[in-house]
From Swiss-Prot:
Mitochondrial intermembrane topological intervals: 303-381
Major site of localization recorded for this protein: mitochondrion
GO cellular component: mitochondrial inner membrane
Membrane topology category: Multi-pass membrane protein
Location(s) in or outside the cell: Mitochondrion inner membrane
Purpose of the protein: Required for the maintenance of the structure of the mitochondrial inner membrane. Involved in mitochondrial morphology. Causes growth arrest when highly overexpressed.
Subunit structure: Homooligomer.
Name this protein carries in UniProt: Sensitive to high expression protein 9 homolog, mitochondrial
Native source organism of the sequence: Candida glabrata (strain ATCC 2001 / BCRC 20586 / JCM 3761 / NBRC 0622 / NRRL Y-65 / CBS 138) (Yeast)
Family: Belongs to the SHE9 family.
Taxonomic lineage of the native organism: Eukaryota, Fungi, Dikarya, Ascomycota, Saccharomycotina
Length: 405
């Protein structure tokens, strides 16, 4: 069993839950056996076996789930470690770049023609760039490996990595099958040549045997050689026949393996696609539910708050505009009143100046008018009467003066 002594708290809690469930099932089994003690042994033994079988099956399924959980956690930890490693490598490259800029051995910038400093070198351009820009560039360089790692982790979780291994196995089987077919063709060709060679040697032997009575020493030597060659050809033919039989069996086995591997691949891909389809369906439902919750939150909470905020801001703007308008009107009215007061004060000053310019008789007339309390019309009539009497008296005096002269 897997040692869970040094697991994380989450893993230890999961293992504890599994152990509690197993203990619960054992308690159920023990209670069941205690209740069945009063029954017959014939009816008690099959029930105990069935419960033990179910208990073992459940225990095995729980252990399989636990092992899958540990395997998936290990895969995620491995890929997370690779991602952290790529980020650390990017930071290391930045540190090396800054260190190289301070190295005196690679810091020669003198132009021998003009005795001036060479500017705008690539290292200077890199240093003038912002640090986050350089980090982003290195992170983007390691992004490909990170994406590959993330894709591999996703394939490991969904089980597509095993399908990929099955595809690779199919390709290898196909290559082996092609090589086996080629080897079978070569062996069959060699087997055919061996048969032809043996047939030819047997024909020559038969010809020599037909004239056995007239053999010469060379014929005897030739017969011995042909007999040895025939034995060798027979052995070679037998070996090639066995090789052809073996390679044909191997070809049949590879063909059967290829057929079964292709069927298994399509079957597993169908299961994987159904799983992904179900997952995408549930993911779609979850997204729809999330969007629905967001819509309800926006409509019931955020929209009224936004409406109140807009209304309050609009009322504030209207109130501010009205205050500005009232201030402008008050300013205009105040200016108008000040202008009227200025005009009245000017009129009063003009009247006072006019009053100061009046003659003595006008002052006397005004004093008499104010003392007698006569109205303006009555005073004008009295003034006309006095003027007429005055004119009449002046005329009489002028006449008397003329008579006296």
């Amino acid at each position: 069993m897997y040692s869970y002594r040094y697991l994380r708290p989450v893993s230890r809690s999961g293992r504890a839950i599994l152990i509690q469930r197993q203990a619960y099932l054992r308690n159920i089994t023990f209670t069941h056996f205690r209740c069945e003690e009063n029954k017959s042994s014939a009816s008690k033994r099959p029930t105990g076996n069935a419960l033990n079988t179910k208990l073992n099956e459940l225990n095995g399924s729980l252990n399989n789930l636990w092992n899958k959980f540990l395997e998936g956690r290990g895969v995620f930890q491995h890929h997370a470690k690779n991602i952290r490693k790529s980020i650390q490598e990017a930071n290391k490259k930045i540190a090396e770049q800054e260190k190289e800029s301070k190295d005196a051995k690679i810091n020669y910038k003198k132009d021998e023609l003009t005795n001036e400093e060479i500017k705008d070198l690539p290292s200077e351009r890199e240093l003038h760039r912002k640090k986050w820009s350089r980090k982003l560039e290195f992170y983007l360089d390691s992004l490909q490996e990170t994406l590959f790692t993330a894709t591999k982790a996703l394939n490991d979780v969904t089980g597509y990595s095993s399908i990929q291994k099955l595809k690779n196995s199919i390709n290898l089987i196909n290559e082996k099958l092609d090589a086996t077919r080629k080897a079978r063709t070569d062996l069959k060709l060699q087997y055919t040549k061996a048969i032809e060679s043996r047939t030819l040697s047997q024909k020559q032997l038969n010809e020599l045997l037909q004239r056995k009575s007239s053999w010469s020493p060379s014929d005897l030597e030739n017969f011995t050689k042909l007999y040895k060659d025939d034995a060798i050809n027979q052995q070679t033919e037998k070996e090639l026949k066995e090789k052809v039989r073996d390679i044909e069996k191997k070809e049949e086995q590879l063909t059967d393996d290829l057929y079964r591997a292709i069927l298994t691949r399509y079957h597993e891909e169908q299961i994987w696609s159904d799983k992904i389809r179900r997952t995408s369906t549930w993911g779609t439902f979850i997204l729809m539910g999330f969007n629905l919750v967001l819509f309800i939150i926006f409509q019931l909470l955020l929209e009224p708050w936004k409406r109140r905020r807009l209304t309050g801001s609009f009322e504030g703007k209207v109130r501010h505009a009205l205050e500005l308008h009232s201030q402008e009107q008050e300013t205009k009215i105040r200016d108008f009143l000040e202008e009227i007061k200025t005009k009245e004060s000017n009129n009063i000053a003009n009247e006072q100046k006019t009053i100061t310019k009046l003659s003595f008789w006008d002052k006397l007339r005004n004093t008499f008018q104010n003392s007698t309390g006569l109205s303006l019309t009555q005073f004008n009539m009295l003034e006309l009467t006095v003027t007429a009497i005055n004119s009449f008296l002046v005329g009489i005096l002028f006449t008397l003066l003329l008579h006296a002269l």
